[in-house]
């Protein structure tokens, strides 16, 4: 096995100064900047604000909203974290061990607050008490659902928090927006976000604080061993090798045309402008059709067929650097071309890794359902299917303005069938098929895996920890594929780069327990102040970067047009020492940041490897130049491009009805310990849905009829129309 160990710096940053906080005394008033403003008298305690501005008869001016005041040291019992004991506000025993010293020079023990939350305590004048059970958002809320008197703030999914808020168990945060100027300003500036968290359009009720893991940017992307693509496709003359395997008997059939011409937009090679390229099927034919006609062929023949196809189909556009079709700034690859490439990769392990076996397409953890579902997400990207990377269930807004459910559409099952064909040809990893233990780290460390679909930063750090970068090994994000998408602008569809994987409100958040705070105004105001603080500039940096001791003082850099802090050298070294360069794990496990509020991507960007930045740069330029299309965080003029809200405003009656549609929840789970019938179809074929089903339309009809999909969609469509009306009324 190959692994490069990164040298670690021994010097740590200077210790962070601390401030003592009094546990009792006069009230704390939170100012407009989110900071305590000295003290206010006990009589200045804020009363709950009514929804909307209050006016007095005969006057035009609304009364100023009361400040959020609470006693110093007000305790908030927090059942909050992110899917694991390691990612709570407090150090768990495994992470802290016998004591862990961080880059701030402080030593932390099990049960201690993490540095970010120490700073929040000091900043706001609150005290946090740990109640987190270390569960996923849904399981954490279910654990506390009958114990809400014992917690003040609790994690949950957006759907669960809203459903239980409507039932009266969680505080309507929307009622207090006038007292939360920073949160309100953020929602006013991002109306689709407000729509995404509004649980009741008649009152404007909001029952949870949303979580953004970055906003308005691509989330997942394809990643490939680009050095392998270059080795197979680039250069003058024919490819040759002393040994190769034979491709499997062909099963996969063409998705793209077999004749005619298709013109698509690409970014030019130097990334400065968009241009058009033509896929000429009249001249080159379809590569899958040609390979299928040839049957089982040796790997060398397969590579030379693909080389010739690229030269002819693109009229020499890529020259001898044919790999750019897949991995270049000007990439224009599609599903058929990827299948041809996978056939070449799997049939040429002797050239690529010196063994007799390579796995083509894999997932981050082939035995973890939460990661296995990335395979059907990728299917949507490959074959032009909306709803498989939705922000809510499997919903998307069609070009007809109505809500659609991917589970009830034949195109979904056709796409999954295509991936099943790839399974039959051995192009998808055996561990994925067998649901056995294997992960992206071991695939790359042992040169056994070619590509997967995932997050850029966490996966490209494997270039530093698993690959031999100095020998040219390179795992990098590549442009999203060209597919036929039916956005309504052409009845025959549009061949274009499109991603549905777009950052908006995530499906988790934090709610305030009505029974927990009871009639304690201090607790209510402290909880509301915490949420509002997260939307100040100071709060956003603290909750993304951690405290000042982890930041290089006096230095900033330009990130998306805004000056953002630079992380301290000791922080950067510690990131590699403790988390192998994984920003998200480091921030959550050790700093306590990136939890449930607005995560600024500037920290993560600095922690991204040069290879990670290179691939992401290609994609970012594609987005900026309009080559890569994506959902929009607004109600778009063409409704097909509208991002689906994370929740839709359904009534208690609706929620009770929806909860009875258990197949739609259990059969399509994306949880770690759940089971996804969509994944099962990829592995076992369409019959995995039900043994009576033999085609895609029958599968869609089965979900619609036998599993109450039709009734589910009617409820969601009604809620969507109500949400649209509310959105228009707020403009």
Protein language model features and the residues they cover:
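C-terminal motif of bacterial Sec signal peptides marking the signal peptidase cleavage site
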Residues: 19-23
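Conserved N-terminal structural module of periplasmic/extracytoplasmic solute-binding proteins
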Residues: 25-205, 213-224, 228-320, 405, ...
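Short, solvent-exposed loop/beta-turn-alpha elements that line the ligand-binding surface or hinge
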Residues: 99-101, 174-189, 231, 235-241, ...
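Short helix-initiation/N-cap motifs at beta->coil->alpha
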Residues: 131-140, 335-337, 433-445
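Extracytoplasmic/periplasmic solute-binding protein
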Residues: 196-214, 257-323, 330-398, 448-451, ...
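A bilobed periplasmic-binding-protein/Venus flytrap-type ligand-binding module shared by bacterial periplasmic
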Residues: 222-226, 230, 505-522, 542
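Glycine-centered hinge/linker elements that transmit conformational signals in sensory
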Residues: 396-430
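Conserved small-residue motifs centered on glycine
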Residues: 533, 537-681
